[in-house]
UniProtKB/Swiss-Prot annotation:
The gene is GALK2. It catalyses: N-acetyl-alpha-D-galactosamine + ATP = N-acetyl-alpha-D-galactosamine 1-phosphate + ADP + H(+). Its EC number is 2.7.1.157. Pfam families: GalKase_gal_bdg (PF10509), GHMP_kinases_C (PF08544), GHMP_kinases_N (PF00288). This is N-acetylgalactosamine kinase. SUPFAM superfamilies: GHMP Kinase, C-terminal domain, Ribosomal protein S5 domain 2-like. Gene3D superfamilies: 1.20.1440.340, 3.30.230.10, 3.30.70.3170. GO terms for biological process: carbohydrate metabolic process; galactose metabolic process. Monomer. The active site is at residue 190. The keyword S-adenosyl-L-methionine does not apply. Transmembrane segments: none annotated. It comes from Homo sapiens (Human). Acts on GalNAc. Also acts as a galactokinase when galactose is present at high concentrations. May be involved in a salvage pathway for the reutilization of free GalNAc derived from the degradation of complex carbohydrates.
Length: 458
């Protein structure tokens, strides 16, 4: 249940090769044995892209890949972080002087986000120190939310070290808020599914208030992740934050057009809620109120009756101050149509008609087209990969995660899975230039996994 704390489970470490290896590496690194372990999963968003931060429901599931941290509280105030991957250097600092550098999305900063979120929630000035060894098997910058899984894992680590309790919902909200310390204006989907996920089911995640509903996926289909091998680091690019701002500006212009108090409006969902109309009707309002040609800052100011200075200081975020072009019509059209597709997807899953897989696949395909054409968050490699997946039997295929690289998710009839994997591997990954990542991490079927939990050695 969402109101419960994350589970604590006792395990025989010797029976779990990854845990055993982590324990041995921890002992080698710190000269002691971990007191406990925490795991938090990555996720794949099946449908509902770039709409969580606009206030709309999304439909993700946790993947089996996760971040796993071995932890030992210490009596000093020193925080020592190490990673099993040599690409990520060791880091140490005082637990009472947490500094997060927004300009550098270094791996340890994501841990610090989770720690700081819990510290601030409880208003603690003195935190106990800890030694932590991090191991992750979620491909980084792939759109499977490795960074948010690390934030969530660190939040639960800190909570456990403190001996405090919070519900899964509270933890998800704290971690979503604290990830913004690193400059990412996300909406909370990644953190919510990391805590609220349950094995065997996808979840409809709703916001304000945060809640999760089981969505039973079709039994005759398998979801396959395929990595384009184009890395996209969310916090290191302005693309993501520009989209957040375009949605905010679109919401304000739509509110002004409908004579609402626009200055209080931040999200596209708020406009719909205030007008009390359907998503389909909101698409018609968007057609009337906004034009397809890009807006410049001066035109936005004219529409809202404000100065450029007011636009910059009161509305734009620090990292969008210098943007000269805003595509408001396209972004609003994507958000309202994608929000409708999420609800249709859930409805089809509930009603389970005979042609369920075909109908769900069509929604996934429409979602990708909207991400590509209206939200412009795809890239040539993702489009090529989606085409290949559909060609070899996927009923639906789309980019998943922020986009601009990362992964696709495809819904494949279970009986076609072996030939699908073989053909996609041959068509996309077996290239003469040898520049792509190992296929094992890049192409795999997945089923809904469980959420974050604490592991104690039995």
């Amino acid at each position: 249940m969402a109101t419960e704390s994350p589970a604590t489970r006792r395990v025989q470490v010797a029976e779990h090769p990854r845990l055993l290896k982590l324990k041995e590496m921890f002992n080698s690194k710190f000269g002691s044995i971990p007191k406990f372990y925490v795991r938090a999963p990555g996720r794949v968003n099946i449908i509902g892209e770039h709409i969580d931060y606009c206030g709309y429901s999304v439909l993700p599931m946790a993947v089996e890949q996760d971040v796993l941290i071995a932890v030992e509280p210490v009596k000093t105030y020193a925080l020592q972080l190490a990673n099993t991957n040599p690409l990520y250097p060791d880091f140490s600092t005082s637990a009472n002087n947490i500094q997060i550098d927004k300009t550098k999305p270094l791996w340890h900063n994501y841990f610090l986000c989770g720690l700081k979120g819990i510290q601030e929630h409880f208003g603690l000035s003195n935190l106990t120190g800890m030694n932590c060894l991090v191991d992750g098997n979620i491909p980084p910058s792939s759109g499977l939310s490795s960074s948010s899984a690390l934030v969530c894992c660190a939040g639960l680590v800190t909570l456990t070290v403190l001996g405090r309790n919070l519900s899964k919902v509270e933890l998800a909200e704290i971690c979503a808020k604290s990830e913004r310390y690193i400059g990412t204006e996300g909406g909370g989907m990644d953190q919510s599914i990391s805590f609220l996920a349950e094995e065997g089911t996808a979840k409809l995640i709703e916001f304000s208030p945060l809640r999760a509903t089981d969505v039973k996926l079709p039994s005759g289909a398998v979801f396959v992740i395929a990595n384009s091998c184009v890395e996209m680091n969310k916090a290191a690019t302005s693309h993501f934050n520009i989209r957040v701002m375009e949605c905010r500006l679109a919401a304000k212009l739509l509110a002004k057009y409908k004579s609402l108090q626009w200055d209080k409006v931040l999200r596209l969902e708020e406009v719909q809620a205030k007008l009390g109309i359907s998503l389909e009707e909101m698409l018609l309002v968007t057609e009337d109120a906004l034009h397809p040609e890009p807006y410049n800052p001066e035109e936005i100011c004219r529409c809202l009756g404000i100065s450029l200075e007011e636009l910059r200081t009161q509305i734009l975020s620090p990292n969008t101050q210098d943007v000269l072009i805003f595509k408001l019509y396209q972004r609003a059209k994507h958000v309202y149509s994608e929000a409708a597709r999420v609800l249709q997807f859930k409805k089809i899953c509930e009603e389970a008609p005979e042609n369920m897989v075909q109908l769900l696949g069509e929604l996934m395909n429409q979602s990708h087209m909207s991400c590509r054409d209206m939200y412009e968050c795809s890239c040539p490699e993702l489009d090529q990969l989606v085409d290949i997946c559909r060609k070899f039997g996927a009923q639906g295929s789309r980019l998943t995660g922020a986009g601009w690289g990362g992964c696709t998710v495809s819904m494949v009839p279970a009986d076609k899975l072996p030939s699908f994997l073989a053909n996609v591997h041959k068509a996309y990954y077996q290239r003469s230039d040898g520049s792509l990542a190992p296929e094992k991490q890049s192409l795999f079927a997945t089923k809904p996994g469980g959420g974050a939990l604490v592991l104690l050695e039995a």
